[in-house]
From Swiss-Prot:
Domain of life: Eukaryota
Keyword Transmembrane appears in the UniProt entry: no
Keywords tagged on the record: DNA-binding, Metal-binding, Nucleus, Repeat, Transcription, Transcription regulation, Zinc, Zinc-finger
UniProt gene name: su(Hw)
Positions with biased composition (Acidic residues): 184-201
Biased amino acid composition, Basic and acidic residues: 571-587
Protein name: Protein suppressor of hairy wing
Annotated function: Component of the gypsy chromatin insulator complex which is required for the function of the gypsy chromatin insulator and other endogenous chromatin insulators. Chromatin insulators are regulatory elements which establish independent domains of transcriptional activity within eukaryotic genomes. Insulators have two defining properties; they can block the communication between an enhancer and a promoter when placed between them and can also buffer transgenes from position effect variegation (PEV).
Keyword Repeat tagged: yes
Compartments reported by the entry: Nucleus
């Protein structure tokens, strides 16, 4: 009996597999699942068992399987009870076929069939590697497939699986025609044999008592980290290289698939409450980046993005670090792929108009449609209320809130725990907190500067690259930052929104108002008295005065003189000098505290700044000039102080002169008395021909100047404090000195003067004339003009500064090609002041070709033009002092 059973087991058995039913579920828009039910139906002629592994490999290896139409083998009754549902869009009805072994087919039938060899492409098999197969039990129903299987007496167990994502996989049974032949490779047969062996070893592999064969179970390879299943071991190994084992992404995804119906019901309820059914958080926090990384200052909007950042950036594997970012990869292949993504991820989409780069084409299209780079005017959106034009829809919506009165309000939940300031969003709060912590994670790649925000880094890099994308529509001046352009536009419109509540003065910037408010606040108060000060240094100096007054002193009983210590008092008592003069308390010499008030407005572009240091930076960077050339920091008193010139007199008449000096420290006049008991206040040398008396005003008192006897040819002594009546003061000019015009004048003069000139020796033809006060002032201005316009090496060739101003000025004019001998007779008849004025006119018209100076000469006197070119610095500083006091 045993030998007979073994003989039966060794016989090859025909395996019949029926594809009873193929259902196609209508695909949805997002996900198109295809559900197929497979059934293994074994032959019911006699109970059979699977042949051994070795026999099957030797008998079936390399065999071909033919698909025959079931109409030949199945009775018509079964055909009537079958389902009439279409299998696919390409097939009209479901056909049931039988798959028989090639060895059991009659040769005559084989020749009658048309066969076609089809080679299955490997990519289609690989597509199913990443889908999870889940067994689903189907309830008993009275279908045609059940009736067929009931006749054979087999149990029913259906395995259904869903093909996710957007890949559409069409079942092979619906796409093949009847009688087609499939070529099965050796690798596939070995995998099928392994599956059959595992099925035979399983407890449910055979059930001899019941007489029914159990359904074959598909054995999958499961990832032990994320619990994802695979049909092949090679697919599992590839998956392990990319598996994000430290995140719960796969677990949550598998849980969602198991409880899909429950999640959909819960999602409908949560959607009404504005809560996401996936993360159970409010939709208000989706765009806020509320998930912060504990290892770096980055924040993320979703949990998935955060987990991906943790896996890539803060991974524990350090064998293959990325040279571009901080990511650490597991293998060299992954590192190469990661670095290629860096290159391809750059910003491949660029705007052809402004050159701005984008990572996605959608961002570029949005930029081209809703920005100033739009080619069509129809892309702009205007407000229906005020007709204001916008390029982006979100900007228009925020603008409409101003009309509706529903402006965005700072939320208290975004409050800084340090300074208690509230912000609109969590991202702005995170940037603000870095100002307290001092954290600056963004480094500039062009300098050593670090910034606290990425937006600030982008603005900072524009100063290195010279990019100025924002230009003024009025004056065409370009700016690197849009905020600076908005502030600049207020100069054209005259808008000054920041107004001081104390004095009513308005400013363009809030920083200017804060600086100005310090003049009214005086926050530093003295504890010993009621005085208040603007700065802490002023308070410290004031406190020192209090401490100095509290110092102990020792006084003399006879003269009431005070001393700091007993040694000085004893020395005073031993000397015995108790006179009234010695008893007086010595007056402390007052310190000459000269306060230098520097200007804060640019002399070239009329811009105002908060401090002089900011103005200096502006002059260096924008105008490329030396700030000291634009405005000086020398004290006004030092500029007003001038050295009195000693007049040249003959030795015979030297005794007749009465010297008079002015004591600047005491402020009083040192006078001398004449023979007729008259007080000589000041002597002035006047021309002999002028016999009339002149009146002068000296320190608010009027004095009479009498002519001296004798002929004295010398220069007249003048002082700034003396003002001669009857003379016209020059008209006031604007305090803003145009530095650019000075530079152009100096360049023109330097180009006009030749370097290789032979200068004659200094002559004394210009001496011996009596100069008036106006002539002396003109002479001094011409000397300044020569120093300012000409270079020192060139002036040194002309004998400057030892040579007279008139001679140097004439040599400069003659060297430029103008012959002064033509009008020598006319110039000889003029006095000193008239000659120098004519020479200056020739200097500005012949030597220096400047249209603006020529226009000034047509409208103003030459003296005013010279002062305009030089710049009245004293008047500028006085105006700055008055502006600061206001």
């Amino acid at each position: 009996m045993s030998a007979a059973k073994e003989g039966k087991e060794k016989k090859p058995v025909a395996t019949v597999v029926k594809i009873v039913e193929v259902e196609s579920v209508s695909p949805s828009k997002d996900k198109r699942p295809t559900r197929m039910k497979l059934l293994n139906n074994l032959s019911a002629s006699s109970p059979q068992t699977y042949p051994p592994k070795t026999d099957k490999r030797s008998g079936i290896k390399g065999s071909r399987i033919k698909i025959l139409n079931e109409d030949v083998l199945v009775a018509p009754k079964v055909e009537k009870r079958r389902s009439t549902k279409p299998t696919s869009p390409g097939a009209t009805a479901t056909s049931t076929v039988k798959i028989l072994n090639e060895k059991r087919i009659v040769p005559a039938e084989e020749t009658a069939l048309e066969t076609t060899k089809i080679k299955i492409s490997p990519p289609k098999r690989n597509k199913m590697d990443h889908y999870v197969l889940q067994p689903v039990k189907v309830e008993n129903n009275k279908s045609a497939s059940q009736a067929t299987r009931g006749a054979t007496g087999e149990d029913e167990d259906t395995i259904a699986f869903i093909l996710g994502d957007d890949d559409e996989v069409v079942p092979a049974s619906t796409s093949r025609s009847n009688g087609q032949e499939i070529l099965v490779t050796e690798e596939e047969e070995e995998e099928e044999e392994d599956d059959l062996d595992e099925e035979g070893d399983s407890p449910g592999g055979s059930n001899k008592n019941s007489g029914h064969k159990a359904i074959k179970e598909i054995v999958e390879h499961v990832c032990g980290k994320c619990y994802k299943t695979f049909r092949r071991l090679m697919s599992l190994k590839k998956h392990l290289e990319f598996c994000r084992y430290d995140s719960g992404y796969h677990l949550r995804k598998a849980e969602c698939w198991k409880n899909l119906e429950k999640i959909e019901k819960d999602g409908d309820v949560l959607e009404k409450k504005d809560i996401c059914f996936c993360c159970c958080e409010s939709y208000d926090t989706f765009h806020l980046g509320h998930i912060n990384c504990p290892d770096c200052p980055k924040s993320f909007k979703t949990q998935t993005s955060y987990e991906r950042h943790i896996f890539i950036t803060h991974s524990e594997f350090s064998d293959y670090p990325c040279s571009i970012c901080n990511a650490n990869l597991r293998s060299e292949a992954l590192l190469k792929l990661h670095e290629e993504q860096h290159k391809s991820r750059g910003k491949p989409y660029a705007c052809k108009i402004c050159g701005k780069d984008f990572t996605r084409s959608y961002h570029l299209k949005r930029h081209q449609k809703y920005s100033s780079c739009s080619a069509n005017e129809n892309d702009t959106m205007s407000c229906k209320v005020c007709d204001r034009v916008f390029y982006r829809l979100d900007n228009l919506r925020s603008h409409l809130k101003h009309h509706l009165g529903t402006q965005v309000v700072k939320k208290p939940e975004y409050m800084c725990h340090v300074c208690k300031n509230c912000f609109y969003s969590l991202s702005t709060l995170n940037i603000h907190i870095r100002t307290h912590t001092g954290e600056k994670p963004f480094d500039c790649d062009l300098c050593d500067k670090k910034l606290s925000a990425l937006v600030a880094l982008k603005k900072h890099r524009r100063y290195h690259t010279g990019e100025k994308p924002y230009s003024c529509t009025v004056c065409n001046q370009a700016f690197a930052v849009k905020e600076v352009l908005n502030r600049h536009m207020k100069r054209h419109t005259g808008e000054r929104p920041h107004k001081c509540e104390e004095c009513g003065k308005s400013f363009i910037q809030a920083t200017q108002l804060r600086t100005h408010s310090k003049t009214h606040i005086r926050p530093f108060a003295c504890d010993m008295c009621e005085e208040k000060f603007k700065t802490e240094k002023q308070l410290e100096r004031h406190v020192k005065e209090h401490s100095r007054q509290k110092r102990p002193y020792f006084s003399c009983t006879e003269c009431k003189r005070h001393f700091r210590n007993t040694a000085q008092l004893k020395q005073h008592m031993d000397a015995g000098d108790h006179s009234e003069k010695s008893g007086e308390k010595p007056q402390r010499a007052k310190r000459s505290s000269t306060k230098v008030l520097e200007r804060t407005d640019c002399a070239i572009c009329d811009k105002n700044f908060d401090s002089s240091e900011t103005l200096r930076k502006h002059i260096r960077s924008v105008h490329e000039c030396d700030p000291d050339d634009i405005f000086g920091i020398q004290p006004p008193s030092a500029k007003r102080a001038k050295i009195n010139k000693i007049p040249k007199v003959d030795e015979e008449e030297e005794e007749e002169m009465v010297p008079v000096a002015l004591n600047a420290s005491s402020g009083s006049l040192i006078s001398s008395q004449t023979d007729d008991n008259g007080v000589v206040v000041r002597e002035f040398l006047v021309d002999e021909g002028d016999g009339t008396a002149q009146t002068i005003t000296l320190e608010n008192e009027t004095y009479t100047i009498l002519p001296l006897d004798g002929e004295i040819a010398a220069e007249q002594i003048t002082d700034e404090g003396v003002k001669v009546e009857g003379q016209k003061t020059p008209p006031k000019k604007s305090p803003v000195v145009k530095k650019e015009k000075r530079k152009s004048l100096g360049a023109s003069l330097a180009a006009a003067i030749a370097d290789n000139i032979e200068v004659p020796p200094v002559e004394e033809d210009f001496e011996g004339e009596v100069l008036t006060e106006e002539d002396l002032k003109l002479k001094e201005n011409i000397a300044k003009l020569i120093d300012m316009l000409a270079d020192p090496p060139i002036l040194k060739k002309y004998g400057w500064p030892n040579a007279p101003e008139e001679m140097v000025l004439c040599k400069v004019i003659e060297n430029c090609g103008y012959d002064l001998n033509k009008g020598a007779e006319n110039y000889a008849e003029l006095d000193y002041g008239s000659r120098m004025r004519e020479y200056c006119k020739l200097l500005f018209t012949v030597v220096i070709h400047n249209d603006s100076i020529k226009s000034l000469l047509n409208n103003f006197p030459i003296d005013d033009v010279i002062e305009y070119v030089l710049g009245d610095e004293d008047q500028d500083e006085d105006g700055a002092d008055n502006g600061e006091g206001n």
